[in-house]
Amino acid sequence: MSLNRNQFLDNFQNRLSAQFTGTQNWWTKSLFHFTDIKNAISIIENGKIYSRNKVIELNLMQNDNANDSVILNTNNEHKNYVRLYFGPSTPTQKNNEGIKPKDKIFQNAHCPIPIMFVFDFKKIFLLQNIRFTDGNLATNPNIYENIEYLNNLNFNLIYHRSWLQNDEMKSKIINARHSEVIVRDELNLENNLRFIAVRSEAEKEYLLYCLSDIMKRIFENKIFVQPQTGIFTNDWLYVDRVSLFENQLNITWHLCGNLSCSGKFKLYV
């Protein structure tokens, strides 16, 4: 490698960001990990994201929002890695995100209140023992260790978020969207995290409420409500705002994007 690791990453990111405009442009500086709020609280309190196997070993799993069949078909060795995506709003996230009617939940894949941890692309790739893939780990993709192979990835497919035609490219694009960066066992938030994104003021307030006082002080200025476009799919029901006025509770909802959840929810206060 003619350039050192730091120089290579600077050069690569400059070239990558020049290829994309709008939403995808800021993705070139970031890596993404989404999980349900219950898991997010544990991550923040522990100061790190653990691999799936480590989370189970430490009994820290609060909400297993993964698809049963995907987990079943994932090599157990791959479960020893923390998994980050190159871009948000992946097909998996779209399938899992939001409060959904029971008849719309497939194989227990459900993330009612998603929290997005946004990491610094360069800082992650400067860590030791970083690997990355050209597809979903569950599909046994190519796994690379040498960062020069970043040049082999097709970011036009990885960042593709347009409507998918039912043709031979569909499965290839879906798999590419799930290209990952993997970190052995655990990933520290400190020095690597850019910010945490949530969907609404209500979800931000709830997340902060659930944190310990010390973590609340540390993270209250790092949690933002949809600071950039494209982080969440916003397809399903969620609470946008909650206010209390003269003993009256007011809840403002973000409604479903279609009629498939009409009349299927009950609210208990």
Range-by-range predicted roles:
Residues S2-V269:
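Active-site-proximal loop/hinge segments that shape catalytic or ion-binding/gating pockets
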